[in-house]
């Protein structure tokens, strides 16, 4: 061979897409192909394949496998003369290494491809049955199956059948194979076959007539006794049916010298793998009527009798199909289906999520779930939607106005492309996978197999991401956009949801008042303004987020109120349109209960906090920042009323910021997962609200002093936080427990100083409770010496004298939480120095005092628990609740605080950790108490967020209870699970309390 000849061939091979032209040249020199190397038709045909190198290698192997020279020449002659055969054979060899292996083992099977013309009719089950008829055992069945598969793959890769036809033929081939396998099983056990009637119901993609190249074939078995007379032995018949079904599954699933066909999976049957393999029809019906979960009815959408007794199969479908179309009436139907979809995504390994073609975001399952959801909601009233095939169902949904035509067309295109990718990925080695390969050679072959010849890798990845993006954008919006079309003006000829269909869909989404919801949608989406246009774009997504809450009606109503208040404000529309997190954060906040929306409605401009830009951010501000802002507001004001109004406005805004951060952290969003550390959320809320209360008191104090006395009050004045306030554990609705301490300035009479201090307190309390748009802050000084009977304000000397002579045990106990919060810092420091010996007594608390604390605790439990309340569900005073944990920790502080520095803190969780570190409590007991305290605190926070008023027990209203559950991480319909979890957690904590506190 001359160098020029070689160079010319090398160049031609390179031009035709060979990646290793040198190796290709060597192959063309042998195996009788030398005469073809100059044939431009053959090289062009090889170059048209997905992988020319692989196709040539497979062709050489096929030629070498021919039994003799005559057979080899026949193959070569056919390749030259018959273009359809040439394109199909080389197309398969270039796309599927596994089918090339099959052809190398069964060298005559290439002739299967000769009999088909370029324009193919769909091959039905019966034709595939004829193709499998020669199979007499599992091995020959596998060979016949691969031969039939070869014909499907050949026409698929050549484009003479599209992806939907390919999937349908693969399903028909699977059905023919199930029938052949069942026939083999019956032939092996004729007595069993005579004893029973057995029907095979195809499920999943086989039932839906849309199977992959390599997939489990999902089935359900139904059996009955063949003899229906009085002497029929049902138990014996069911054993026979089970034996036949199991044998049929083995024939398909077991690996032989010819490999396996595919696994037959019967786990969609009632009770899954724990249930009997075969049931009678009546047993199936009883299960679905009493026990089936929502997803099981969704699975029945695709149920189709395919093998065995046709009459029994038809009876099965007739009995169960009516139940399928009642599934949408089940409580929490849509949330349950959507939650299951989210769970699938969450279970994808992180290393695979970006390559998941089927299960990942924007994948095939998103389209299938969305379509099935709509079918189940509207299928009871519209039988045109009763299809198990995704693309057929999508077309029917569009025709009926249940889905916008443009959306349906985009989803159809995306689904076809993604399914084509899935088919070609699996076809290469006939392995079950839904992962897009990472190897560049694999990506190149995959791209070329889909017709992307110019830069196939880049083109493939770009097209895949584009279609996945379309699916991700549309799959949930698909459910909501037609609701807007139902209340909007549409172009002539465009189908729309009927009012009844719109009502059905809203009810399925969890809306209690669908008529009101439609009115809100009409008000929000109607018109030609920029506001209406942006809201029409946003609402389909917002409706989905509202539906994910426990109260979609309130979420939509609140959005309308905010929109009415801010809709003409340019920054508001820009925020929702452009700030990635703002719209979802707003939806979560508006539908999570009453508190946050109420705070927002009083000043809708706080929506700006929900953005993810520089001006946004939900992280609460620290005490120094808050105090600086409140004091600046006071300086700008003309009088105390105006000043405190401004301070309360800051408090309202920051309460909203904290509540929004808490809600977003508890619910999670598309961009921010649920906060895994629930203790961190509790600390965030407690710290933020406590810091905000300190800053509010500091600003109010400054305003009152400035109004009455100018810059200097006649007496030094300090506010000491007590209880949860001092412990940095305030909730949204907590009062501010405080002590007031003052000290006359030099030259000021004690009476004058006392009058001034009392006037300050009185005016602060009045101004912070004046009815206004802002929530009041109640100041509670009942923990002062002598309680309500004692003076409201004392001097430092008076406190010292009282504590030295009259202090009771409960007062030392209460002082554990005392911390300076506002006013004269130096005076506050001296007060803390005064009380330290009381709360951390030298030598620890005596036994008499310990017994007194225990008696007081027991009395409080019996006297303060509200009448009629369930103690086991009372988050504050119930067993294992806040009081139990806090008193246990505080007893450890009183006994050991003098010697363990870590216990000298006002914060419960910090003190608990210090007790653990000091060996006073085990790691296990610490975790138990901490978990109970965090959960009880979150319950109280949730109740306040949901109801807009404080409470220590779970709500009795079902919707409010569901909203509390949603905040605590329990989906719709799982309020019972939430209550059980609380009882278990509290019960474990109570056991520890009895061991540590009462022992």
Swiss-Prot record:
This is Bifunctional glutamine synthetase adenylyltransferase/adenylyl-removing enzyme. GO terms for biological process: regulation of glutamine family amino acid metabolic process. GO terms for cellular component: cytosol. It catalyses: [glutamine synthetase]-O(4)-(5'-adenylyl)-L-tyrosine + phosphate = [glutamine synthetase]-L-tyrosine + ADP; [glutamine synthetase]-L-tyrosine + ATP = [glutamine synthetase]-O(4)-(5'-adenylyl)-L-tyrosine + diphosphate. Its EC number is 2.7.7.89, 2.7.7.42. Gene3D superfamilies: 1.20.120.1510, Beta Polymerase, domain 2, Nucleotidyltransferases domain 2. The keyword Magnesium applies. Keywords: ATP-binding, Magnesium, Multifunctional enzyme, Nucleotide-binding, Nucleotidyltransferase, Transferase. Belongs to the GlnE family. Residues 489-999 are annotated as: Adenylyl transferase. InterPro entries: GlnE, GlnE_rpt_dom, NT_sf, PII_UdlTrfase/GS_AdlTrfase. The keyword Amino-acid biosynthesis does not apply. It comes from the Bacteria. Adenylation and deadenylation of glutamate--ammonia ligase. Residues 1-483 are annotated as: Adenylyl removase. It is an enzyme of class 2 (transferase). Pfam families: GlnD_UR_UTase (PF08335), GlnE (PF03710). Its cofactor is Mg(2+). GO terms for molecular function: [glutamate-ammonia-ligase] adenylyltransferase activity; [glutamine synthetase]-adenylyl-L-tyrosine phosphorylase activity; ATP binding; magnesium ion binding.
């Amino acid at each position: 061979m001359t160098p020029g000849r070689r160079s010319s061939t090398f160049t031609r091979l390179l031009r035709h897409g060979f990646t290793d032209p040198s190796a290709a040249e060597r192959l063309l020199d042998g195996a009788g192909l030398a005469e073809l190397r100059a044939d431009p038709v053959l090289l062009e045909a090889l170059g048209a394949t997905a992988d020319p190198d692989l196709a040539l290698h497979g062709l050489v192997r096929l030629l070498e496998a021919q039994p003799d020279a005559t057979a080899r020449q026949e193959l070569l002659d056919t390749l030259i003369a018959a273009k359809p055969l040439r394109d199909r054979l080389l197309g398969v060899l270039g796309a599927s290494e596994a089918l090339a292996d099959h052809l190398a083992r069964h060298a005559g099977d290439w002739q299967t491809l000769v009999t088909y013309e370029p324009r193919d009719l769909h091959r039905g089950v019966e034709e595939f049955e004829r193709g499998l008829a020669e199979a007499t055992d599992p091995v020959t069945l596998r060979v016949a199956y691969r031969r039939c598969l070869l014909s499907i793959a050949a026409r698929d890769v050549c484009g003479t059948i599209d992806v939907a036809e390919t999937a349908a033929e693969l399903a028909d081939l699977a059905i023919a194979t199930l029938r052949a396998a069942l026939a083999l099983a019956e032939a092996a056990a004729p007595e069993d076959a005579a004893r029973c009637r057995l029907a095979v119901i195809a499920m999943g993609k086989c039932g839906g007539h849309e199977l992959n190249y390599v997939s489990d074939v999902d089935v359900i078995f139904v059996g009955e006794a063949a003899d229906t007379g009085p002497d029929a032995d049902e138990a014996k018949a069911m054993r026979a049916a089970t034996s036949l079904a199991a044998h049929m599954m083995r024939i398909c699933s077991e690996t032989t010298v010819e490999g396996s066909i595919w696994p037959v999976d019967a786990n969609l049957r009632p009770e899954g793998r724990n249930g009997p393999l075969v049931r009678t029809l009546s047993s199936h019906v009883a299960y679905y009527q009493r026990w089936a979960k929502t997803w099981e009815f969704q699975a029945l959408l695709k149920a189709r009798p395919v093998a065995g007794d046709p009459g029994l199969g038809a009876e099965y479908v007739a009995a169960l199909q009516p139940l399928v179309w009642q599934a949408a009436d089940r409580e929490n139907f849509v949330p349950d289906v959507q939650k299951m979809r989210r769970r699938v995504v969450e279970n994808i390994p992180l290393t695979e999520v970006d390559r998941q073609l089927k299960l990942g975001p924007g994948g095939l399952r998103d389209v299938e779930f969305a379509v099935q959801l709509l079918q189940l909601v509207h299928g009871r009233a519209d039988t045109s939607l009763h299809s198990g095939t995704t693309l057929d169902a999508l077309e029917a949904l569009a025709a009926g106005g249940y889905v916008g035509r443009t959306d349906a067309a985009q989803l159809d295109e995306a689904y076809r492309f993604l399914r084509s990718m899935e088919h070609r990925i699996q076809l290469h080695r006939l392995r079950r996978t839904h992962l897009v390969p990472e190897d560049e050679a694999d990506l190149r072959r995959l791209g070329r197999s889909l017709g992307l010849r110019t830069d196939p890798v880049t083109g493939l990845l770009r097209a895949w991401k584009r279609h996945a993006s379309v699916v991700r954008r549309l799959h949930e919006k698909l459910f909501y956009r037609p609701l807007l079309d139902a209340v909007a003006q549409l172009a002539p000829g465009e189908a729309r949801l009927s009012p009844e269909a719109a009502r059905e869909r809203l009810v399925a989404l969890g809306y209690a008042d669908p008529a009101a919801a439609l009115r809100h949608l009409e008000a929000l989406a109607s018109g030609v303004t920029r506001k209406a246009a942006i809201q029409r774009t946003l609402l389909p997504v917002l409706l989905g987020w509202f539906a994910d809450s426990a109260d979609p009606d309130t979420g939509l109503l609140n959005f309308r109120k905010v929109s009415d208040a801010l809709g003409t404000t340019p920054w508001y529309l820009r925020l929702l349109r452009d700030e990635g997190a703002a719209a979802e954060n707003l939806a979560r906040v508006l539908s999570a209960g009453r508190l946050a929306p109420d705070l927002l409605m009083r000043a809708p401009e706080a929506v700006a906090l929900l953005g993810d830009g520089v001006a946004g951010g939900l992280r609460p501000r620290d005490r120094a920042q808050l105090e600086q802002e409140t004091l600046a507001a006071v300086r700008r004001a003309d009088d105390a009323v105006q000043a405190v109004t401004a301070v309360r406005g800051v408090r309202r805004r920051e309460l909203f910021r904290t509540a929004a951060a808490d809600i977003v952290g508890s619910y999670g969003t598309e961009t921010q997962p649920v906060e895994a550390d629930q203790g961190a959320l509790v600390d965030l809320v407690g710290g933020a609200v406590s810091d905000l209360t300190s800053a509010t008191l500091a600003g109010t104090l400054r305003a009152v002093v400035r109004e009455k006395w100018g810059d200097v009050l006649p007496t030094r004045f300090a506010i000491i936080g007590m209880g949860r306030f001092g412990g940095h554990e305030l909730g949204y609705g907590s009062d501010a427990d405080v002590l007031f301490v003052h000290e006359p300035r030099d030259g000021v009479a004690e009476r004058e100083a006392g009058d001034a201090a009392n006037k300050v307190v009185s005016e602060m309390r009045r101004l912070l409770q004046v009815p206004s748009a802002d929530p009041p802050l109640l100041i509670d000084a009942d923990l002062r010496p002598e309680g309500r009977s004692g003076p409201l304000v004392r001097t430092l000397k008076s406190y010292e004298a009282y504590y030295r002579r009259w202090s009771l045990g409960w007062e030392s106990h209460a002082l554990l939480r005392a911390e300076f919060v506002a006013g004269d810092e130096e005076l506050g420091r001296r007060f803390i120095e005064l009380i330290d010996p009381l709360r951390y007594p030298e030598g620890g608390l005596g036994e008499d005092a310990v017994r007194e604390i225990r008696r007081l605790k027991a009395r409080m439990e019996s006297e303060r628990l509200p009448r009629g309340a369930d103690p086991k569900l009372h988050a504050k005073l119930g067993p294992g609740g806040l009081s139990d944990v806090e008193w246990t920790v505080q007893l450890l502080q009183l006994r050991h605080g003098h010697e363990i520095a870590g216990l000298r803190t006002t914060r419960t969780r910090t003190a608990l950790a210090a007790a653990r570190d000091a060996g006073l409590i085990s790691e296990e007991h610490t975790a138990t108490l901490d978990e109970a305290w965090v959960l009880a605190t979150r319950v109280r926070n949730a109740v306040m967020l949901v109801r807009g008023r404080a409470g220590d027990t779970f709500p009795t209203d079902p919707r409010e209870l569901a909203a509390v559950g949603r905040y605590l991480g329990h989906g719709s319909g799982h309020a019972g699970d939430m209550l059980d979890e609380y009882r278990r957690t509290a019960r474990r904590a109570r056991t520890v309390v009895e061991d540590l506190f009462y022992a």
